[in-house]
UniProtKB/Swiss-Prot annotation:
DNA-dependent RNA polymerase catalyzes the transcription of DNA into RNA using the four ribonucleoside triphosphates as substrates. GO terms for biological process: DNA-templated transcription. InterPro entries: DNA-dir_RpoC2_beta_pp (IPR012756), DNA-dir_RpoC_beta_prime (IPR045867), RNA_pol_Rpb1_3 (IPR007066), RNA_pol_Rpb1_3_sf (IPR042102), RNA_pol_Rpb1_4 (IPR007083), RNA_pol_Rpb1_5 (IPR007081), Rpb1_funnel_sf (IPR038120). Residues 7-24 have a biased composition (Basic residues). Its EC number is 2.7.7.6. CDD domains: RNAP_beta'_C. This is DNA-directed RNA polymerase subunit beta'. Zn(2+) binds at C250, C317, C324, C327. Residues 1355-1367 have a biased composition (Low complexity). Gene3D superfamilies: 1.10.132.30, 1.10.150.390, 1.10.1790.20, 2.40.50.100, RNA polymerase Rpb1, domain 3.
Amino acid sequence: MTSTSPKSRKSSSKRKGSKKKAARSKNVIPPLSKTPPSFRNCVVDKKSLKQLVAWAFKNHGTAVTAAMADNLKDLGFKYATQAAVSISVDDLKVPEAKQDLLGQAEEQITATEECYRLGEITEVERHTKVIDTWTETNERLVDAVKKNFNHNDPLNSVWMMANSGARGNMSQVRQLVGMRGLMANPQGEIIDLPIRTNFREGLTVTEYVISSYGARKGLVDTALRTADSGYLTRRLVDVAQDVIVREEDCGTTRAILINAEDGRFGNRLVGRLVAEDIVDQEDAVIAKRDTAIDPELSKKIEKANVNGVMIRSPLTCEATRSVCRKCYGWALAHNQLVDLGEAVGIIAAQSIGEPGTQLTMRTFHTGGVSTAETGVVRSNLAGKVEFGPKARVRGYRTPHGVEAQQAEVDFLLHIKPTEKGKGQKVEISSGSLIFVEDGQEVDADVTLAQIAAGAIKKSVEKATKDVICDLAGQVRYEEAIQPKEVTDRQGNITLKAQRLGRLWVLAGDVYNLPPNAKPVIASNANVQAGKVLAEASQSSEFGGEVRLRDSIGDSREVQIVTTSMTLKDYNLLEESNHSGEIWNLEANDGTRYRINSIPGSKIGNNEVIAELSDDRFRTKTGGLVKYAPGLAIKKARSAKNGFEVSNGGSLLWIPQETHEINKDISLLMIQDRQWIEAGTEVVKDIFSQTAGIVTVTQKNDILREIIVRSGEFHLCTDSNILERFDNEGQIVNPGETIAKGIKPEAMVFVQTIETTEGKGVLLRPVEEYTIPDKAQLPELSHVTQQQGPSLGLKATQRLGYKDGELIKSVEGVELLKTQLILETFDTTPQMTVDVEVTEDQSTKTIQRLRLVILESILVRRDTISDSSHGSTHTELQVKDQQIVKAGDIVATTQILCKEKGIVQLPEMKEDEPIRRLIVERQEDTVTLTAASKPVVKIGQRVIDGDLLSNEEPINCCGEIEAIKENKVTLRLGRPYMVSPDSVLHVKNGDLVQRGDGLALLVFERQKTGDIVQGLPRIEELLEARRPRDSAILCKRRGIVEINQGDDDDSVVVKVIESDDLIEEYPILLGKNVMISDGQEVKAGELLTDGPVNPHELLECFFGDLRDRKPLMEAAQEAIAKLQHRLVTEVQNVYKSQGVAIDDKHIEVIVRQMTSKVRIEDAGDTTLLPGELIEIRQVEDTNQAISITGGAPAEFTPVLLGITKASLNTDSFISAASFQETTRVLTEAAIEGKSDWLRGLKENVIIGRLIPAGTGFSGFVEELRAEAGPHPDILAEDPAGYRRIQNLRPDYTVEMPSSPAAANLTSVLDDPSDADLEATRNRHGIDPSTSNFAAFARPSGDDNFQEDQSPDPAALEGLQEEGLLSDE
């Protein structure tokens, strides 16, 4: 039986129409004839499974693949059930090699630390080396884990899961059985203590805590990522939702070039259509234009060594507002050419948005691990190194502190073998590091060089690290450092190292001297332990009587009474009540003052000491305060302490009882506005204290307050009188007539009031308080002295309330307070006054109040010596109650020497105090005996391994102090390497304690901080954000010239352009120049490091091309360059996270971002300057205008971020449903926009069928029907429905003036055939061009026209497939 394909059998059975046969043939399994069966014997992991399923799908279609996948699933389940793969603790096998690897790492790190100790590398280099060592160890351990499982236990559950790709990956297995590795702290810096253990061995507490940083970061990031990713997807969908495949072929000749990377294309060509024939080296055609590239063809192209392929892409598709099938290529869902009506925009948006959650927010700063980009070359044989005549190298220091040479040009490095045989050649590229010298003899397997990967200049940033001193001693510079004083713009002077060199600290015992201590011993003197090195004295500033206090803490207090004042005419009485003790001052006439500042407390200037206890100014209830004329108060900043009286007078008081209630209204027991007697119960359990008229305030059935106003009430009907006393009320003097028959005898306050009986006036009693001008004061109010501070008291009267203030209260209040206030003169601000109790000198039973001003001197007690201070001994020079003068010494402190040695004082300027001194002890020096004559000199500094005599190495670091015959005395020291440009915190000869900062190393590291990783970076690219502090870009191509600026640090870069114009680029401080003098640069190339501003880049590209090409070409080429860059950048982020996205998805989005131009000059078109418009629309407009001979529109291309592009779409319904709804709709209404409902969103919102998928062809029919006889709306054109706007000189568009008129007026005048003919002739339009269609009338029917009759072969093919009936 000849095998037929399933498809042909199906169609033939259909053609014969025999149902029986059809039913029978269903049961026969179609033989798989397309490919011969193949037998593969290998382990199938996740990747192979993918390939297997893809192969089945490609060769045998969906049904077979589904059946096979089902069978695979059953197979998997069956064996998984039998195998019972599970994880147990025993499955976690730690490789035995781990201890060796850790041991090796420890050795390397010990060696690094030793180099650091000897001052051979800087702190930064040490840190970098440690991090790199651990990173490398970790990698090697992963390999060991893989090897261990593969060799010893290939069926281990953990290994099978990770290896097959079923669950988990190697980085997780590494943490289970390898080591957890390096962790970062919250600032993103790597902690150089790695976690050496794994989860199988268990973590120590420290390691557990270090791990917790990362754990929290992971949780927080995940929570933030989901939200961010969702919003990104929404914006992408919005920008691309109207991209639908609407055409078969746009016919463009433009294309994009895809270059091979290392001779491979990978998957980048699969599913694309060829734009230009691909030919191999012999000019044989491999693939013709419009061939779809499948994986086989892709491999074939690679084999033919084709470097670049021109393919069709959505970026260059010329279909209007859509993409054509051929430019899009395969739909990746079924690996066939995409169907018409496919909503490729939404697919693109989802493909980019969906992996968003997998992207990390930020990655750690790695410690400059740059092993990936550079290849290390080792020698294959022993021999002699030769650089050759072309070589140019310069000295270079690697980040690990290894001295090497860097190649300035490309050259060949030869190794001439020592024995006969073939030598070795190494290609050295410019920028590579060479670790051997010219002419050096090397063994086999020696590292020769590190080859730089291309001339990529990494962007770097400056970072700093402190160098901390490990021992106390004296600083000495090496001459190599060449310190230089640098003044910055603020005038601060810093000391900087100009060259690489060592900074030494020579050991010694450094003493910190207290302030005002002076050395009492000469430099270079020998001292014994216990000898006085320095003395400090403390003296009294004002003098007075000495009081010695008990010691407090580690110091004793000496108090000196400088001023005192006793109040002799007042007795001090102590009373106690429930709230504690109360102190009162009582004068002979019985007036009493209550003391605020109790004895033992301290008070300052202008503070209140006591208040007069006076009941004369106390009221019975609350009320209203009025000042009578004459009474005046001082203005005060705050009314907290009341108002000070400046002029005495009368204070008037109108009593009024106020109860604040806040209870339910049902508890009220009286009526509003009725007269009540004293003692009436107004609310349950609340009684009135006075008689009068009640006012009740309530809100929402809650009683707020009840006011009782006492006085005489008179009914009154005279409206003038009622008006006169309305609102606030008035004071009426005695004898003045208020109304007929109402004449008060005393002063009253008259107010209009409404009661239950009716309106009238209430005469309220007024109490008058007389306030004197001056307050009375105890005798002896001042103590003055010639020198030092003076004391005084003054009395003030303060009113508690201002004029017209209402006091709501039931209890009484105090209207006036008389206060005693302290005044001090000539005092320092920190001086306080102490309040004390003394006995009267004549009668011991009476106590008096005494105010004293004390000078307090803290005297240090003797201290036993510690690491930074010598022991001190303090002696008091005064006795208790001794009188001292100002400037007398109260105590002296001596600093004693701890151990015997030689004293050295630092070199100081004359007026500078000495704050530290150093004693060089016996233990700070060592004496070495040389076997033969020493080769060292006095003053020379040596490190471990330097020679003492011809044979003997020295085993310590330090400075040679003396040489006597064969004995060499060495003062121990510690070298610290500092790199050029480091900031030095200490000067030569300075004394430092352990833990002091010596220098700040300034180093360059690869910029990682602002290369935002993952989602934020994707967002930055797609939103086309302008980065902060971006790189300076070259505007036009030319040759670079670099000059120094006015000051040392600044640089001026000049670019000499092709027409000899010179463009200057001033470069700011802190920017690194990325180009070299004499280099040729292109437009858009980076002159300095930093992130690139995409808008500026587009400007540079366009500006440069504009000079050489027509406007349209320049714009298209500039956009193409930018598009390529954007696609690459977005892909890089996803690739770095291991996410694979097809280029075409990103291209669809980027196309939407770059499809608009801004009109600069409208020419003779109807466009507006500043308008954003599709580039293809401008192209059409300019073409049409050029037919009429008018001036075309000038424009510049723009890049829009996805949000901006969404808001700038033609459809206002889509834009309004996205963001800024009100603004979009208002603008659309003002402009009278129409929405042509082209996209999906608009149609969904309105509730129509969406124009994609099955709705697509319906959409086409409907448009045709709508178009009718108006060629203006839709031009009949195979390239979709193109709206030609505002271009016909002989068409008028009348807008309806009102909705009613809209139904009557025809919107477009329909031209006659004659008109169209005339127009065509006028413009000389050839009927064969596409422009002809714009001026032709579309045919109304959809039948085949004569010249379009179908190809008979095509009809037969359709019949063959059963898609066309025999009729």
